């Protein structure tokens, strides 16, 4: 088959496909549409301001009211939806935003202005920076000789109670709760004729650092208020670790813990009153942790 025959065959096929119409058609030149860009001044809504307890993304749920009632009972991410095999964009963005807040809380420091405002006694463990704090938890439990002298010089020897504040794994937890919980503890202790004076602030703090403080000060009870590891629900959760005459290397069972102290958990004012009661009971029974009945 030569070129001429091939050309005739193609023309025949095209004629059959067009229903026998052989009139030439001229394709219209495409026209360019003009899209006008409108720039408006405004702000992008903050996705973290959405209350996920009230947000239901499931389309046409069988029991909408029951679903929302269940969501009020937990901060878990229930009632999400998907686009094919993946979560919707809004859900993914909220997840990443909450994760970023948690990361920021771990790697940031408690404001020095807050430490000065609260008249804390600032000390530092043997950790030099956040990286060392995260990779060497053993150094976050110990103080060097210089810090030991600072603690000794600014606290009352053999006091009934020594309050300690530590940044821990969440600076946001301290900044969000400390101003409310300390007055509540002090007020609650007045009922038992108890009080505390200078408060130690520990930078790069691990929980067992309270044990060395207990040995340095000789206090009957040491109460450590520390920022807990943040999660996707909140970065502002604080805990109180309380022990009667803590010593270095003591078993963890000797600590009494009140956790989940934040606005969405146990309110700091309520927690402060309970902490005061626990401190009184420890002094009365001379024990703490699982030994405190």
From Swiss-Prot:
InterPro entries: EutC (IPR009246), EutC_C (IPR042251), EutC_N (IPR042255). GO terms for molecular function: cobalamin binding; ethanolamine ammonia-lyase activity. Its cofactor is adenosylcob(III)alamin. Its EC number is 4.3.1.7. Its main location: other. It is an enzyme of class 4 (lyase). It holds the Pfam family EutC. Adenosylcob(III)alamin binds at residues 207, 228. It is found in: Bacterial microcompartment. One of its GO terms (cellular component) is ethanolamine ammonia-lyase complex. It catalyses: ethanolamine = acetaldehyde + NH4(+). HAMAP family: EutC (MF_00601). Belongs to the EutC family. Catalyzes the deamination of various vicinal amino-alcohols to oxo compounds. Allows this organism to utilize ethanolamine as the sole source of nitrogen and carbon in the presence of external vitamin B12. This is Ethanolamine ammonia-lyase small subunit. It comes from Listeria monocytogenes serotype 4b (strain CLIP80459). The gene is eutC.
């Amino acid at each position: 088959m030569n070129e001429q025959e091939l050309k005739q065959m193609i023309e025949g096929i095209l004629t059959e496909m067009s229903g026998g119409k052989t009139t030439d058609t001229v394709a219209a030149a495409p026209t360019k549409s003009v899209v006008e860009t409108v720039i408006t001044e405004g702000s992008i809504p903050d996705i973290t301001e959405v209350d996920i307890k009230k947000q239901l993304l499931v389309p046409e749920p069988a029991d909408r009211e029951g679903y929302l009632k269940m969501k009020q009972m937990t901060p878990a991410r229930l009632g999400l939806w998907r686009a094919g095999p993946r979560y919707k964009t809004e859900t993914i963005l909220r997840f990443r935003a909450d994760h970023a807040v948690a990361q920021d809380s771990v790697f940031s420091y408690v404001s020095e202005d807050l430490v000065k405002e609260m008249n804390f006694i600032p000390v530092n463990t043997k950790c030099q920076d956040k990286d060392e704090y995260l990779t060497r938890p053993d150094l976050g439990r110990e103080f060097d000789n210089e810090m030991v002298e600072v603690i000794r010089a600014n606290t009352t020897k053999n006091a009934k109670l020594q309050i300690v504040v530590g940044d821990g794994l969440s600076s946001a937890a301290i900044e969000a709760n400390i101003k409310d919980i300390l007055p509540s503890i002090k007020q609650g202790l007045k009922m038992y004729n108890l009080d505390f004076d200078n408060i130690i602030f520990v930078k790069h703090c691990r929980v067992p650092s309270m044990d060395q403080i207990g040995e340095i000060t000789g206090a009957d009870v040491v109460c450590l208020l520390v920022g807990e590891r943040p999660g996707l629900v909140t970065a502002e959760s604080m805990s109180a670790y309380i022990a009667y005459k803590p010593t270095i290397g003591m078993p963890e069972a000797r600590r009494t813990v009140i956790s989940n102290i934040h606005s969405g958990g146990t309110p700091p004012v309520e927690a402060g009153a309970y902490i005061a009661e626990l401190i009184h009971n420890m002094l009365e029974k001379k024990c703490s942790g699982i030994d405190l009945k």
